[in-house]
């Protein structure tokens, strides 16, 4: 068993070395062709690191490793804050069936929600005439009691 593990490790090491040699050749080839753009990339990276340094520790360390480490720690802190603050809202609600919903619904009790504007007249009455039918004429001519053809004379 020991022999097979050692040979597997040696094979992996060999593979790594082959890939790293190929990568170095590719990197050298690219760097000679794109030296100007890599300078621009380095400048952009430096600008962004300094902006991050201003956010994370404006009066502290200025080396890149410290700035990135503090940035990572601050992001982790913010992620934990999001978890803590959103935990009450993300708690699993028990699944309810339609029967349970109807048991607690207003319609099952013969009630419904009405906008407040519609209830102002009801609030001003004594309650006795709420269910009384409202007698409003459909036309002024239809309910003229003084006319000769009225059945209520």
From Swiss-Prot:
Annotated compartments: Nucleus
Any one annotated GO CC term: nucleus
GO molecular function, one term: protein dimerization activity
Major location (coarse): nucleus
Gene3D superfamilies listed in its UniProt record: Helix-loop-helix DNA-binding domain (4.10.280.10)
bHLH domain mapped to chain residues: 29-78
Annotated family: Belongs to the bHLH protein family.
Protein name, entry field: Transcription factor bHLH154
Taxonomic source organism: Arabidopsis thaliana (Mouse-ear cress)
Taxonomic placement: Eukaryota, Viridiplantae, Streptophyta, Embryophyta, Tracheophyta
């Amino acid at each position: 068993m020991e022999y097979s593990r050692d040979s597997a490790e040696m094979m992996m090491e060999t593979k790594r070395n082959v890939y790293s040699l190929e990568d170095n050749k590719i990197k050298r080839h690219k760097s000679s062709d794109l030296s100007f753009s890599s300078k621009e990339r380095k400048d952009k990276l430096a600008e962004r690191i300094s902006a991050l340094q201003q956010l994370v520790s404006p009066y502290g360390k200025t080396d890149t490793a410290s700035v990135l480490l503090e940035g990572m720690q601050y992001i982790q802190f913010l992620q934990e804050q999001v978890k803590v603050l959103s935990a009450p809202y993300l708690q699993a609600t028990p699944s309810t069936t339609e029967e349970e919903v109807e048991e607690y619904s207003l319609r099952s009790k013969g009630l419904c929600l009405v906008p407040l504007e519609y209830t102002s007249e009801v609030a001003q009455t004594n309650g006795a005439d709420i269910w009384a039918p409202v007698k409003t004429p459909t036309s002024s001519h239809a309910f003229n009691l003084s006319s000769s053809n009225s059945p209520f004379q």
